Amino acid sequence: MGLFSRKRDHTPAVPKEKLIPCDKIFLDPPAKYGNAPLLEPISEDQNEKYRAVLRHFQDDDLKLPENLNDLDNGTHANDRPLSDWEKFWLSRECFLRYLRANKWNTANAIKGLTKTLVWRREIGLTHGKEDKDPLTADKVAVENETGKQVILGFDNAKRPLYYMKNGRQNTESSFRQVQELVYMMETATTVAPQGVEKITVLVDFKSYKEPGIITDKAPPISIARMCLNVMQDHYPERLAKCVLINIPWFAWAFLKMMYPFLDPATKAKAIFDEPFENHIEPSQLDALYNGLLDFKYKHEVYWPDMVKKVDDLRLKRFDRFLKFGGIVGLSEYDTKGQHDELKYPVDMVI
């Protein structure tokens, strides 16, 4: 559907006896979706550009500022080297994501990666002891007490499903809402299994009338633009598609205002007023949208379970990163896997 077209779905609900009770995140897509594919080869020219980016961040003398103001102003008083966690983030796939997002322009890819590394330091996402003010689950937990953002299930390409339910808004607009988006993006991308880099976002604008919900109105443009900049600048090539449903008139007006700020790649991935079931298998979809998962959000159950599972998963992959040398450019295929031997050495040409 086009951006300003509207379509209504009247598919009947799934019979109750077929529903699957669910109140927690799960980390494994169905086995029938297959094993992780091997890494796709790149051209000789692309490989040379990849290696140029790799060499830049392999430099032992590389030091970066702790905040974007210092980066923009060329201030180096508080520069520090890359931590092990930052090297873990700088995977082969990460380099390629930034290269693709920058149309294989090496200088722009390095600039984008540098900006994101500094931004991650500033917002508290390095996951190391050097984080002065880490972005923790406790810091944003109150934002999700009504379940307005949920990671649940996978599409048939094994991409995690990230639900955003604007009609379950429980807090006034603030920077903490941006922080929650960042925290949940980190969660969704961490949940992505071996061989998967992208996520699918499902946005529901339906108004819910429950205790704790204060509004179903769209956020202020300032907050929305901040969130959009986070997605486009710091999570490039992470969005597979974004499906939006139950869009009221005021949300259409909001989307029209935001549309000019979307980059062409993001615009191409937006799908308006199509049922989620057109894109997701029933066994992986919330029953609210004619799926089979009888999902009930209980904050005291879902939130701590999600935090522990994802923290444990991240640490497990970091331990594998250290096992395989702890160097810049290791493949996520190796850190996400179960195998004992390194399949993609940093200097390997694919």
From Swiss-Prot:
Key words, A-Z: Cytoplasm, Endoplasmic reticulum, Lipid transport, Microsome, Transport
Molecular function GO terms recorded: phosphatidylinositol transfer activity; sterol binding
PROSITE patterns, alphabetized: CRAL_TRIO
One of the Pfam families matching this protein, by short name: CRAL_TRIO
Gene3D superfamilies in alphabetical order: CRAL-TRIO lipid binding domain (3.40.525.10)
Annotated compartments: Cytoplasm; Microsome
The reaction(s) this protein catalyses: a 1,2-diacyl-sn-glycero-3-phospho-(1D-myo-inositol)(in) = a 1,2-diacyl-sn-glycero-3-phospho-(1D-myo-inositol)(out)
GO cellular component terms given for this protein: cell periphery; cytoplasm; cytosol; endoplasmic reticulum; endosome; endosome membrane
Domain annotation CRAL-TRIO: ranges: 139-297
SUPFAM superfamilies linked: CRAL/TRIO domain, CRAL/TRIO N-terminal domain
GO biological process, one term: phospholipid biosynthetic process
Top-rank taxon, per record: Eukaryota
Note: Present with 5040 molecules/cell in log phase SD medium.
Functional note: Has phosphatidylinositol transfer activity. Involved in the regulation of the phospholipid composition of plasma- and endomembranes. Altering plasma membrane composition may provide a possible mechanism for multidrug resistance. Contributes to efficient phospholipase D1 activation and phospholipase B1 inhibition in the regulation of phospholipid turnover. Forms a complex with phosphatidylserine decarboxylase PSD2 that seems essential for maintenance of vacuolar phosphatidylethanolamine (PE) levels.
Assembly and binders: Interacts with phosphatidylserine decarboxylase PSD2. Also interacts with PBI1.
Protein name: Phosphatidylinositol transfer protein PDR17
